[in-house]
Amino acid sequence: MALFRALYIIWVFLLIPLSNAEEFTPKVTRTLSRYVFDIVNFDDSNTLIRAEEDSVEISFDAGENWKTIDEIEEPIESFVVDPFRGHDRAFAFVKTAPKFYVTDDQGKSWRPLTIPISEKASNYFCDVTTHPIKKKHLIIRCDLLTIKNSGLMYVGREIYTTNDGVSFSQVKPSFGKIDGHISTARCDFIKSSEDSDLGGNDASILCLFRNTEYIESTGSTIDKSELILSADGGETFKELVQFKDKVVSRYEILKHHVIVLTQDDMYNEMSSTNIWISNDVSTFQVARTPTKIRHVNMGQIHEDSIGRIVLPVSRERDDEDSNQPGAAEVLISDSEGLKFLPINWIPNNQFGYINVAYPGFLKGTFFGSFHPFIEYSDRKRKYSRQKVREETKVSVDNGLTWTNLKVVDRENVDLFGCDVTKPERCSLQTHFYDLRNLNPSAGIMMISGIVGDGSAYNWKEEKTFISRDSGLTWRLVHNSTGLYTTGDLGNIIMYIPYRSNENGDVPSKFYYSLDQGKTWGEYDLIMPIYPYRLVSTISDGSGSKFILTGTSITEDPIFITYSIDFSAVFDYKSCEEGDFEDWNLADGKCVNGAKYKYRRRKQDAQCLVKKAFKDLSLDETPCNSCTGSDYECSFEFVRDAKGDCIPDYNLIALSDICDKSKGKSVLVKPLQLIKGDKCKTPMKIESVDIPCDEIPKEGSSDKEIVTTENKFDFEIKFYQYFDTVADESLVMLNSIGDAYISHDGGQTIKRFDTDGEKIVEIVFNPYFNSSAYLFGSKGNIFLTHDRGYSFMIAKLPEARQLGMPLDFSAKAQDTFIYYGGKNCESILSPECHAVAYLTKDGGETFTEMLDNAIHCEFAGTLFKYPSNDDMVMCQVKEKFSQTRSLVSSTDFFQDDRKTVFENIIGYLSTGGYIIVAVPHEDNELRAYVTNDGAEFTEAKFPYDEDIGKQDAFTILGSEEGSIFLHLATNLESGHDFGNLLKSNSNGTSFVTLEHAVNRNTFGYVDFEKVQGLEGIIITNIVSNSEKVGENKEDEQLKTKITFNDGSDWNFLKPPKKDSEGKKFPCDSVSLDKCSLHLHGYTERKDIRDTYSSGSALGMMFGVGNVGDRLLPYEECSTFLTTDGGETWTEVKKGPHQWEYGDHGGVLVLVPENAETDSISYSTDFGKTWKDYKFCGDKVLVKDIITVPRDSALRFLLFGEAKNMGSGSFRTYTIDFRNIFERQCEFDITGRKRADFKYSPLGSRTGCLFGHKTEFLRKTDEKCFIGNIPLSEFSRNVKNCPCTRQDFECDYNFYKASDGTCKLVKGLSSANGADICKKEPDLIEYYDSSGYRKIPLSTCKGGLKLDAHLAPHPCPGKEKAFREKYSINTGAYALVFVTILLVIFFVAWFVYDRGIRRNGGFSRFEEIRLGDDGLIENNRTDRVVNIIVRLGLCISLITKSAFQRAKAGTAQLSSKFRARFGNKKGATYSSLLHDQLSDEPDGFHEDSNDLSSFRGQGSNSEIEQEDVDTSQQEHTSRTDLLGASNIPDALPARSASHESDLAAARSEDK
């Protein structure tokens, strides 16, 4: 039956002949082309132009005949018809040359003009901007491209001004090109239309040049811009001084205003934007918006009929492939253009896409559509149903009131799925895309849409509707959608469907109406067409000719153009006076203080108007009495929920009304007449008394601080920011399950509409910072991947929610695991168990992955070098059992399942490791570690006398290849403490860093690594741990700090005076008795609060006291350090909460556990503090937060106002942006850095971790930092030689009181052969020296405490080891024997010829120098005798020297005996042995002696047998001490190496 009715309707509309034009058929001319898609037409003419492959053709008879334009010789890239002279002038741009052609006579003649482009290119894409009045003034823009690597590469854009081609002048910025091209280059005439109020000098031109430089190392950008103005048609330009130090992103020129957008942060292209407004192009003012604006849809900015600016604001898409439109908000200014407020009809303050259309020819009329960003997934088709309804509305009073689009169509009422007589529930829903190019008419318009309640929008069900009363009521005209346009001011309507039927056939006919849509005729086309474009030949819609373009359905597509002419309809008859009727705009209501009436053709009149729209009669009758619709709120006021104008104290602070007032209050009228309103008799407006005593005065910095208050009936229990630089989005949840979303740091907050479903939990994705998941109480999960701008609703598996957190893949955003309960009618049922459900499509579908799983990790995405990228590990707890096992799989447990451990306590991942706690005998724990998912190694904890059973441990995180772990040694409730341990690089071997470190019953530890700085850790220790362990005393906590990753610890140095300038009670030189102590991690209300900030380098706040121990929290004060913990200052008495902003450029404190109305803030790194009153009544501030990166200038306070009834829970957003004069200047090249300088932290100018590091700090407190990644630009000045500070004790070694690493008594060092198991390719290993290098250290050379001694072969690699170190004995033996033979022959020859035949050795002492008794018969004899004499001489000298030395030694020994009575004192070696020797024996005693590692050589280089023991005992103690190179702070060698030391020192001398 329904099908029959639909067919009947189609027959009624399409097949009934037109009674008023029965014989008429429009004139249709077809043009075919294979090379051109579009054809250009001149206004109100039959002249068409098209470009073929090698020529340009023109037709003067609507396409019937074509001829080639001989003047145009090159291939044409594009045509542009002058929008102000569309009947005559057009431009044709050449593709391969900087050249274009101009016609001023509708194409009859053409003249060429060549652009003097400064750079060569292979392709040119140019366009032109013409002046609305001065015909000869042109602006030419050309984009240059060149061929590179068989593709086109963008070269840049050049802009020229010209006086009709007589001369060209290039417009360039002063800063020139950067990185090859300027990213933005644009110029426009200030006078954008003939009726523009701007441009007193019609030749004025505004130009913007902008360059965006990308910093690859940090991923950030630096923007630079220049906004220039010409008052002489482009001959000279001057920069607008107001924007000299700002980054101008874009501008827009309207009829009454020029809008300029400046970027708040030049180092963040996604930063918020300031909107500058001018109506004279000489002075600009910053417009006031409800919140900071980030993304403005510049192409959609327009002005309404009273000059108000309509400003569409959008979000930036995170996913370019998203099929959802960008979220948006529409702001409308006041009539001055300086205060913007959001459109006031959006349902439930929801987020969504808002489209606002304003037909300029209908005064006061707005159309608006809202598309919510909440989609529902039914697991079969994505986004199939929406939970939040769409809304489509119309306003005829400038947006003051809005109504639904009412459908009035009795004939078709059965075709709609709802009752159209009830428009509040059944109305026309549309997106108004079609209204953007709507032709002017007197209230006649067409639109595509559906009829419904907004709960579903199926694009396939769209139909076409018509209205004759400017959109108030609508009627169905076509059961399909397609292209449509109007002519003769709505008296001719053309329509062609996209598809001719439900089968999708290509349309072969178009439809037309000559009675304003009442009846329709049809025309059969010669060739079916895929329609692309249907337009009137006259831009204002007053013509009777149309152009239809598209493609054929042939295998080889042909471009088709139909020229359609209705000018002969009604026998060319023009309408007379009797053919017109009055039509009242806005249903006869007053609009802008006047009633408007059009004269339009009667619907059934048999004529055409044949007039331009501007010539259509419009009667304007001012209204006698002004009403509320003629007024708007004064600048200092805003409308409340009731529509009343109430004072806004932020706006009052921005205005100057209180500065001009001499009293404590000022009278201000809350309403002002809208600028340009026509009403005659003004309303009587009563002034409002505004108190000024709490308004900051002019010149006060408080005047620039902006505070926004929001009230809630229920307490906000959860809140968290998305960690991105795109904006300051956060999600909040109150105590009854209502979620709220803000995108501006809490300044504007909207409740998240879940259709009545309460939110029970919110989870953020730790790997993808824009994603969050909201769990509903009815089994739905709300997912967002764009920081809460849009949501998809997924139905959770049919399982009970167990409240277990999701587990996410680190590499796939849409992949996560949800845990639900099966057989859980009762949570206590023995059959109730958890099931892990896997989704890979963001929740659209879930599959059951593993039964009884309670915790899983995507292990393959966590490791740096995973054994399998798809590996998943799960903790499984079987039903009816308390035992938990660890299993793994590489195919999500489809076919592969491996049991890793049969029985575990639990496991977790941190920094590329997975650590498993496994139960051991005697109720102990053992930890196993893996960094690839395949091989697990038991973590070796150090032996220590205070470590008993391994009952509990806490993983504190990992960094730079080491795991920090707290091993509990005392687990008595309220008296928990343990040892702080640190692992080696593979996480398997731990050493003790500190004893008795405080923890609480929940396993949290007073341990915090200072963010952004290497190796600085703060802990609290139980100083009386022995007595606490014996239950004799309560815990006494002390705070310690390390600057070298735990190797050395010290107490915090206290400040000399407190915040009031008084000395502290204790003043001891011993830090053990007088130091600073801070309350730590175990006492925090929110574990996200930290001492430090990763962006405020070196800064830390803490609540504590100066003394010998930590006092209770309420007795403490607030302290600050700016040098990483080296020195501290008390900044406030009493405990305070703190927060960092602008990388530490703004520090904020608020009292804790006390009601207040003020905060304290500092802009000079804590040197001075100011108070700011942020509210009238005192509140208890529960928390103060800002973005996770601490880079924003907005802070959010959560407070509770006691005894104030409804709305007692409040948030305050405090914005400090305006207190800074400018943004700090930062030069990435390092050539200029006026606002920053490099310096070390505190007095640590030496080396730390083997290098000297300097950090950037701003030098001018008047500027803000913004998104400059300062931490990325810290620099290592140099690497340093290794010192003791670069080493820590190895496994089974402990740090003794003298600073050396000693082997634990009774234990041996770690088995060096273990590394052979980890690295199978190794063939050798080394024994431990007792020291290992700190992973953070980059030192080179110097002390080598970890120096390896003799290598050992790895098990099974003995042969390779021998081959590596073996010697080629054969070759060495041959050389050695050869040398021996030569020596033997020479010795024998000298003896035989020089000694034996001269009498032998018996004559040796008788020979004298110069004696001629030697036989010399020839030259050989003489050479031999010379050798003999030389040997004799050396022998005599040596003998004589030895005898003299022997005599002198005997004499000196005799003198000493006589003086000291032969008493024998201890030598240096024996002294060191007696006083400083170590207890351990054997090889590992070397680890106690630092001097043994000083040189590059090994012990084997020292020959012990060369030094006689008796000689050492007689050696002067004084001389040895003088020769010693051992530092005073370091012990000497043990007894077993005394001779080595003495020998080495003797050789040095």
Curated annotation (Swiss-Prot):
Signal sequence region: 1-21
Basic and acidic residues: bias regions: 1535-1549
GO cellular component: cytosol; fungal-type vacuole; Golgi apparatus; membrane
Top-level taxonomic group: Eukaryota
Spans traversing the lipid bilayer: 1370-1390
Location(s) in or outside the cell: Golgi apparatus, trans-Golgi network membrane
GO aspect biological process, one term: Golgi to vacuole transport
Repeat (BNR) residue spans along the chain: 57-68, 101-112, 159-170, 228-239, 393-404, 465-476, 511-522, 740-751, 837-848, 1040-1051, 1119-1130, 1160-1171
Ranges annotated as biased composition (Polar residues): 1489-1501
Topological relation to the membrane, as annotated: Single-pass type I membrane protein
Lumenal side: 22-1369
Principal cellular location given in the protein's record: Golgi
InterPro entries tied to this protein: Sialidase_sf, Sortilin_C, Sortilin_N, VPS10, VPS10-sortilin, WD40/YVTN_repeat-like_dom_sf
Residue stretches in coiled coil: none
Region (Disordered): 1479-1549
Cytoplasmic side: 1391-1549
Keywords associated with the record: Glycoprotein, Golgi apparatus, Membrane, Nucleotide-binding, Protein transport, Receptor, Repeat, Signal, Transmembrane, Transmembrane helix, Transport
SMART domains: VPS10
Further remark: Present with 279 molecules/cell in log phase SD medium.
Family membership: Belongs to the VPS10-related sortilin family.
Role noted for this protein: Functions as a sorting receptor in the Golgi compartment required for the intracellular sorting and delivery of soluble vacuolar proteins, like carboxypeptidase Y (CPY) and proteinase A.
Entry protein name: VPS10 homolog 2
